[in-house]
């Protein structure tokens, strides 16, 4: 039934017609959630213009309402801001663009007590509420322009679409699909790589992957998100060599093609047999032209792409050593390529913006070449070799960039070392830029409590503006919610408002995810995280002296003592909380055994340690069906296979 006038017709939502799918979706989401939390029907009406005599909630753009706080003409295309002015369940929900209108709807629901602690319906915490009793007034601009996630890990279509759906609920505005078809990420899931207990699906192929990407794009577009695409593969696709992943190419390469490859150690061939790791002879104008033709063709066929990533190879110390290439730095040749690409796009009236990457050898800035049209480009800083035990907040100063020696580079390991390259680039490029980082690619697996890595991403994001960056795109596994989504929530909320308190966000998250025992759970996670930070699974050379034996014993004791709290809550009355506690129960079992294996490895009892690790793998393989929405088993096994293969901790 339609809710009657106890709220003075606040049970009606008016959406001002813009023929925009994102605004319409925002209105539908508001109706759906309000009906869930009020147990009443909510009417949805379309209107041509605002009429303050009509009671209820009004959804539209700032231009639809009198006295809008926005100066729309001054707003950058990708910047987000929201405006909510609701009193007694009536008023305005607006945003500076359609995407921001959707953010405003979710923010309004957040103020009513709704929370989304992980992707999927079982991650929704929806309290009962009477919207007529609420006054919500919010006027905010996002702290950073770029707030995104990049596909990585092993994924199903549902994992991806659930993630996209969840992202806008907490303030992310961009999604990046690597490669043209994201084949390898889907293949890892559908062929169950790293889980021998599951059989490959048998019907997965490249065409299926392309269909999945098309469906994911529909979800991105429905929400008005910034769509980023490709990155890898531009150095091989122009020559008919398919680069779907980091696997070796099985066919012969004819000399007409290999003449364009980088000359390394006297040979022009695929670098280590891997197409996407192979650089080209960038001083060769024909090689550049072939790349540019391929990129321009793709851009012309895909106008839906907002930010097109144009990267070189994913290898390093493999730059061309021919007599022409050695006269210029790799970055000088890269900027020359970018300028020629801009010329080609401009000639066809294509306005797609291009993301260029500073990474590996390209960390060293150009010496001579300059961007002719910097507004076309966005700089992506990718400090993949950095430590995740230090944040950008610890930087007191940066040193000069070391000299560049072709094919003899040592990549920086410290945060300061990486940022020194960023600063050098910023002296040559004054345009838009963001951090492309990897907190939840590998490092999160080494922090079972997730609190340290969550605080690290918080500190990094809070200080992005201090190192001249306007956002953050996280290259990461999509299922980084095990034991929970604290880190992902902190990432999104801090990107929206860098002044938020980590402690307050953590307390709110744990209360929303776990209920009344959330504070106990947070304390447990903090202690587990701190103990594993002391053990330091990242780098042996960076370890402090700690009593490792006591550390391991404290971990066992901590998990054992907390098991009774898990058991008490495993059948919690709230379905969202119950699922959170079930995940935590599986997590405790896994990490009890993981700790045994790591302790044995630390003591040098390698054979016994490997035996425990094999048992843990069997445990996670068997449990994958119960926690696959939150836990990337493929990634977990890969990270710890590497640690145990070293046969020392």
Identify the residue ranges that each predicted region occupies.
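Carbohydrate-binding surfaces of carbohydrate-active enzymes
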Residues: 503-522, 604-611, 617
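Aromatic-lined carbohydrate-binding surfaces of glycoside hydrolases
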Residues: 16-20, 38, 48-52, 63-69, ...
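Histidine-centered catalytic/metal-binding microenvironments
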Residues: 541-649
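Short, surface-exposed acidic
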Residues: 44, 516-523, 577-578
């Amino acid at each position: 039934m339609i809710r009657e006038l106890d709220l003075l017709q606040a049970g009606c939502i008016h959406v001002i017609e813009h023929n925009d799918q994102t605004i319409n979706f925002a209105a539908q989401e508001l109706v759906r959630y309000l009906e869930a939390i009020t147990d009443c029907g909510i009417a949805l009406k379309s209107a041509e213009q605002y009429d303050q005599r009509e009671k209820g909630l009004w959804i539209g753009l700032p231009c639809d309402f009198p006295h809008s706080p926005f100066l729309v003409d001054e707003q950058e295309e990708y910047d987000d801001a929201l405006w909510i002015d609701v009193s007694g369940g009536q008023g305005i929900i607006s945003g500076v663009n359609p995407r921001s209108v959707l953010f405003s709807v979710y923010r309004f629901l957040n103020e009513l007590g709704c929370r989304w602690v992980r992707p999927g319906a079982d991650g929704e915490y929806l309290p009962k509420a009477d919207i007529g009793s609420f006054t919500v007034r919010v006027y905010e601009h996002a702290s950073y322009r770029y707030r995104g996630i990049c596909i990585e890990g092993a994924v199903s279509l549902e994992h991806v679409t659930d993630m996209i759906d969840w992202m806008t609920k907490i303030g992310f505005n961009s999604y990046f699909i690597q490669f043209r078809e994201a084949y390898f990420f889907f293949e890892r899931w559908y062929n169950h790589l790293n889980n021998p207990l599951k059989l490959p699906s048998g019907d997965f192929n490249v065409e299926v992957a392309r269909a999945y990407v098309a469906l994911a794009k529909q979800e991105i577009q429905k929400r008005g998100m910034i769509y980023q695409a490709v990155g890898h593969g531009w150095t091989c696709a122009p020559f008919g060599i398919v680069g779907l992943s980091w696997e070796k190419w099985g066919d012969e390469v004819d000399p007409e093609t290999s003449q364009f490859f980088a000359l390394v150690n006297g040979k022009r061939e695929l670098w280590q047999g891997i197409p996407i790791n192979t650089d080209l002879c960038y001083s060769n104008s024909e090689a550049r032209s072939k790349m540019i033709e391929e990129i321009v063709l793709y851009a012309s066929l895909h106008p839906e792409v907002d930010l097109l990533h144009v990267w070189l190879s994913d290898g390093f110390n493999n730059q061309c050593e021919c007599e022409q290439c050695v006269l210029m730095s790799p970055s000088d040749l890269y900027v020359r390529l970018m300028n020629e690409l801009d010329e080609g796009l401009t000639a066809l009236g294509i306005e797609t913006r291009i993301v260029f990457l500073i990474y590996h050898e390209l960390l060293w800035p150009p010496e001579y070449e300059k961007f002719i049209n910097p507004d076309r480009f966005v700089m992506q800083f990718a400090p993949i070799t950095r430590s995740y035990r230090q944040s950008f907040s610890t930087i007191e100063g940066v040193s000069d960039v070391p000299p560049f020696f072709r094919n003899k580079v040592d990549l920086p390991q410290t945060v300061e070392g990486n940022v020194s390259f960023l600063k050098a680039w910023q002296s040559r490029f004054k345009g838009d830029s963001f951090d492309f980082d990897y907190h939840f690619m590998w490092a999160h697996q080494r922090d079972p409590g997730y609190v340290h890595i969550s605080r690290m991403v918080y500190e990094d994001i809070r200080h992005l503006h201090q190192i001249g960056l306007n956002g953050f795109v996280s290259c990461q596994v999509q299922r980084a919610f095990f034991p929970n989504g604290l880190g992902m929530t902190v990432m999104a909320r801090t990107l929206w408002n860098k002044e938020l308190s980590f402690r307050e966000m953590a307390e709110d998250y744990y209360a929303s995810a776990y209920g009344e025992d959330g504070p106990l759970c947070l304390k447990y996670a903090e202690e587990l995280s701190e103990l594993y930070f002391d053990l330091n699974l990242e780098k042996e050379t960076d370890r402090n002296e700690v009593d490792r034996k006591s550390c391991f014993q404290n971990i066992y004791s901590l998990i054992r003592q907390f098991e009774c709290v898990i058991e008490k809550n495993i059948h919690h009355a709230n379905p969202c909380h119950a699922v959170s506690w079930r995940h935590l129960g599986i997590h405790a079992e896994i990490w009890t055994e993981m700790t045994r294996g790591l302790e044995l490895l630390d003591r040098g009892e390698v054979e016994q340690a490997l035996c425990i690790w094999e048992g843990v793998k069997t445990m996670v393989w068997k449990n994958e069906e119960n926690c696959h929405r939150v836990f990337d088993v493929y990634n977990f096994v890969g990270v710890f296979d590497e640690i145990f293969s070293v046969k020392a901790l």
